[in-house]
Amino acid sequence: MYYLAKEAIDLGHEANTLYLASYQTAGRGRFQRSFYSPQGGIYMTLHLKPNLPYDKLPSYTLLVAGAVYKAIKNLTLIDVDIKWVNDIYLNNHKIGGILTEAMTSVETGLVTDIIIGVGINFTINDFPQELKEKAASLFKTPAPITRNELIIETWRTFFETPAEELLYLYKKQSF
């Protein structure tokens, strides 16, 4: 998803665009680590154009983590945890991650584009041996909600909830 969003930016596509995938063949996390992303997950990247100095940017990773927590809680009453700085956990197992990248204009010094990638193990039934002890899925099939419902609620929450509340939720659920 990241590469698709980067390509769209290079082609001049509009901001506030959400890119979605059913699976990824080369998903990446922090430090370019591989992110297992088969069918049954939610893989999405949001492109924003803040046009702000770096020191004036909101803490996008923290805000999105707060929004993911609140969206899951609103729809399911499940309390997930947030492992500093960008991982979503359920019962001590990683179920998701958030990756944010900023692009800066050399001419203006402003951050022109932000790409926020979110991956959530929604209904993944089987993990590779090396992940079985660390990773889990939010739900077993059948899930009580749809992937679309969680996608919509996550971004509705991100855009409509005051930043102070999302940061509070982030801090409250962090470990």
Describe each region flagged by the PLM.
Residues D10, P53, S59-D79, L90-F175:
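Long, positively charged amphipathic alpha-helical accessory segments at protein N-termini or as interdomain linkers
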Residues M1-I78, G96:
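N-terminal lobe of the biotin/lipoate ligase/transferase fold
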